[in-house]
From Swiss-Prot:
The lineage of its organism: Bacteria, Bacillati, Bacillota, Bacilli, Bacillales. This is Uncharacterized protein YkuH. It comes from Bacillus subtilis (strain 168). It is found in: Membrane. Keywords: Membrane, Signal, Transmembrane, Transmembrane helix. Residues 1-29 form the signal peptide. Its main location: membrane. One of its GO terms (cellular component) is membrane. It comes from the Bacteria. It is a single-pass membrane protein. The chain crosses the membrane at residues 152-174.
Length: 182
């Protein structure tokens, strides 16, 4: 009976390790990879205006831009976050028909314009579309564009460290069980 209990505990803990590794791999493998810029140049703003078929007013504050390296179907996509005075949003979007407009606080759609609720007289607009022409993908990124994504070297060492800790934990449990059962 003691041997059966030991085997069941080891089997249970081993299955937890496997489940953890699969879960961690899926999280890392499917996390988005993108370049992000919070300091857009006037040339990049012009590229975004052409991509989204819009002319941003002078008081537009450009929060950040993201270029996702792989979107649905393998396309790249570009997402731009801007902030405007709430009074200007209606004028800007009144005749805008290029993309679907979503009035929501759930920012993050990869296609369309998300309009957030007004906070302190400012409204955040998120423009997202597929970058089929490679407007940004083919562009050489300068130092302002920071890569955000999975670093597989970091993934490997993090997973190895977690597994080592779990292995030590399993050894301690098995030794304690041996003391209790003997």
């Amino acid at each position: 009976m003691k041997k059966l209990l030991k085997k069941l505990v080891v089997l249970f803990l081993s299955s937890l390790v496997i489940i953890f590794n699969v879960w961690y791999f899926i999280i890392c493998a499917f996390s988005p990879e993108y370049y992000q810029n919070t300091n857009l140049t006037s040339n990049e703003i012009i590229r975004f205006e052409k991509l989204y078929h819009i002319d941003f007013p002078d008081e537009t504050k450009f929060i950040k831009a993201r270029e996702y390296l792989a979107g649905p179907g393998g396309d790249t996509s570009a997402v731009l976050y801007v902030s405007l005075p709430t009074k200007r949003v209606e004028k800007v979007l009144s005749d805008y028909t290029y993309m679907k407009i979503n009035y929501t606080d759930n920012v993050g759609s990869m296609y369309g314009v998300d309009v957030s609720k007004s906070v302190a007289g400012l409204t955040t607009l998120t423009f997202g579309t597929y970058d089929k022409k490679g407007t940004f993908y083919n562009m050489k990124h300068d130092d302002d564009w920071m890569y955000k994504g999975t670093d597989w070297n970091l993934y490997f060492w993090t997973a190895a460290s977690y597994n080592a800790v779990i292995f030590v934990f399993v050894l301690v449990i098995v030794k304690q069980m041996n003391k209790i059962l003997n």
